[in-house]
Amino acid sequence: MQSSTISKATREKLGRVSTATICTALFKRGLRNQMIQGALPLDPDKPTMVGPAFTLRYIPAREDLNPITVFQDRGHPQRKAVEECPPGSVFVVDSRKDPRAASAGSILLTRLMKRGCAGFVTDGGLRDAAEIAKLAIPTFHQRPSAPTNLTLHQAMDINVPIGCGDAPVFPGDIIVGDSAGCVVI
């Protein structure tokens, strides 16, 4: 699925249903691997996150292709993805379950929030976790991580099928996140 729209009514209904209930409903329909493993909320008291997935895939960093100067490149896949993520979408990052370097930090999360993003999910770590927890954007990650993403992650593909926390995530899949974690519909 390349794009998905979700009605306000559906978004509101899903916002009232726990991820546990959604997982059981999906399991009854034969879908067993829909929970994103290891992606926990920075602030479990934030409202439930609901929106279509917009994805970014990281691969292991190669030092000669991933120097600090790439941050100056507006065409860099990470920067480009942040600017292309549609309002109301959930930005989902495949960090290969590696939290040793951040998937993003407060600058990018603030930009996504200002652009109307419904939330952020990674199976990796985040820089500036305490600052991000104060932002008005639901955010899910494995753990805080101070090193910049460039030390271990190289942004590669935008809005393609990814694996996040061992769950398949296709662009446009509906992501629901609450205090227990995130599920892919």
Where do the protein language model's features map onto the residues?
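Feature captures the catalytic cores and cofactor-binding loops of soluble hydro-lyases/lyases
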Residues: 1-171, 177, 185
